[in-house]
């Protein structure tokens, strides 16, 4: 196998129930294409429903229905068809569990990232309550490629902010895969999985430095915001080479290094 960059494969947490995602870049896969494997772990009695949602045109002014307290996103004029793996517990759906493959071959799965330091009491870090389930739905409905999905994710998070405390998203197609790890609000770290790499997404933040991978994505204030909140202090003033996203944004008792 080709050289694999040092993606963090460390501890998966202290509980016996953990989602996990494995990603193989196309040069690391025997198929010559990206491979994604995902295990969804949710407690209690869960019904898993599978179905196809056809493409659709929407009237001007349509919005995406959302969980109570979350933002109602404007719907786009046309949405793609997608295969939907839906997890339902009792009579309710699970906002952070469902997976998708759309008609363009874009895959969306996610993992819990435990708790971020951004508290749920900080309503100012999101707009109109922020976005939760509709992030994954919007990706399924709109992404023409995995790279397009990465763009959509960042645009939605930049505008609305992410409502839950911590979550990771994998967005992949046959040629590329992207990992994003989101804190509550508008702060995240993302990376394209190198073609010759095998990557693991556990249940805690494991993206670290600003230049660890050939392609990385983060908001312009990801460092300065952490400094302002007291979550990160550079060893040398003005030098952010020791910045660690996972350490800065993960709740201290859930940081595994």
Model segments located where?
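Repeat-unit-sized solenoid/scaffold elements
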Residues: 137, 143, 181-185
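Second-shell loop/turn segments in exported
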Residues: 123-125, 135-142
């Amino acid at each position: 196998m080709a050289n694999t960059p040092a993606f963090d494969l460390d501890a998966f947490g202290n509980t016996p129930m953990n989602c996990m995602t494995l990603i193989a870049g196309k040069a690391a896969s025997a198929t010559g294409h990206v491979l994604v494997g995902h295990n969804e772990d949710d407690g209690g009695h869960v019904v898993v429903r599978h179905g196809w949602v056809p493409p659709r045109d929407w009237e001007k002014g349509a919005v995406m229905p959302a969980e109570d307290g979350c933002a109602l996103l404007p719907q786009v004029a046309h949405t793609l068809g997608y295969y939907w793996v839906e997890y339902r517990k009792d009579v309710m759906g699970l906002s952070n569990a469902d997976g998708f493959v759309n008609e363009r071959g874009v895959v969306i799965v996610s993992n819990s990232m435990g708790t971020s330091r951004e508290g749920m009491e900080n309503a100012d870090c999101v707009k109109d309550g922020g976005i939760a389930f509709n992030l994954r739905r919007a990706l399924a409905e709109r992404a023409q490629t995995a790279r397009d999905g990465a763009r959509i994710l960042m645009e939605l998070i930049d505008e609305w902010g992410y409502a839950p405390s911590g979550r990771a998203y994998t967005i992949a197609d046959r040629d590329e895969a992207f990992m994003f790890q989101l804190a509550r609000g508008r702060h995240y770290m993302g990376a394209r999985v190198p073609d010759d790499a095998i990557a693991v997404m556990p249940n805690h933040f494991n993206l670290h430095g600003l230049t660890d991978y050939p392609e990385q994505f983060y908001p312009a204030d990801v460092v300065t915001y952490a400094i302002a909140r007291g979550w990160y202090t550079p060893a040398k003033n003005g030098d952010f080479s020791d910045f660690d996203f996972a350490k800065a944004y993960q709740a201290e008792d859930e940081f595994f290094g």
